[in-house]
Amino acid sequence: MPNYINYPSWLHPEVIQGIPITWYSLSYIFIILISYKFIWYQIQSDRIDIKKEDYETFMFSLVLGAILGGRLASTLVYDKSGIYYSHPWLILLPFDQDWNFTGFRGMAIHGGFLGAIIAPLITINTKLKNTNVQKYFLKLTDYGSIAFSSGYMLGRLANFANAELYGRVMKGGIIFPNAEPFDTNIPGVKEFASSVGIEILPHDLLINLPRVPSQLIEGFFEGPVTFMLLWFLFRKIKKYDGFIFGVYIMLYAFFRFFIEYLREPDKELGFIINYKPIKSLSDFSFLNISMGQILSLALMLSGLIWIIVTKKISDKKTKSILT
């Protein structure tokens, strides 16, 4: 009996085949809408006096910053083909170098986090200076963390629909149609294929093997699990504004770092720290570190620094009120 699952044949990147509307694009639209509504709901629930037009300006800068940051990180950090350096306009245009429509197919959330902070910071110190958006900026970062995590799973479901960001080889896993096939001469490949019920014919030079659906595991822990921790736990024990955002950054980075061990490293980058070169299918080392893990460690440190800095800001405000 086969010990693997075939990728659903009916699932495609496009919502309707032949029409250039993708699940990936829709996921971003819905995440933005969920975040917009949920942040505003929290503002109203806590009776924060922020004008709707100021809030919309803030949200526009946040979304724009997140998209720009995510695209820049994806195209300039993860892509090693050099095409975005020679054709920089492709970073912001949904076309390939031959002007065929492709949609936006690359976003790196680490860059998105950075852009989602830098752009609103610029906005509140220029267009929204001396408004209540500036006054409650740290509180808004907390609201945004909760809102974004509530819809995050949609993005990972879209990754699954694209059959991308799949994990490493695993019995009982899913055979992704776009996964990199293995050379049948690699030690352990034939044995593994046989163990899961895949027949290798004498003329087969390459074979596709079942993999961990790591995008779904990431989505579950970085989405619903993180949201529930923020909403039901950390929101209750929050002592000062900005705390939840720092916790969110650290939670995301923590889950991402460890789930990354299940994920296939980016083909062009491989392991940034390659302590134990992979020579057979069974080779594995916790000391082999990917780019995603390095960025997650940096993100975790950033979250800790954010918590410390916002705590000092809170203490300073409290002290000035008391004196």
UniProtKB/Swiss-Prot annotation:
A 1,2-diacyl-sn-glycero-3-phospho-(1'-sn-glycerol) binds at residue 156. One of its GO terms (molecular function) is phosphatidylglycerol-prolipoprotein diacylglyceryl transferase activity. GO terms for biological process: lipoprotein biosynthetic process. The chain crosses the membrane at residues 15-35, 58-78, 106-126, 242-262, 289-309. GO terms for cellular component: plasma membrane. It is a multi-pass membrane protein. It is found in: Cell inner membrane. Belongs to the Lgt family. Catalyzes the transfer of the diacylglyceryl group from phosphatidylglycerol to the sulfhydryl group of the N-terminal cysteine of a prolipoprotein, the first step in the formation of mature lipoproteins. This is Phosphatidylglycerol--prolipoprotein diacylglyceryl transferase.
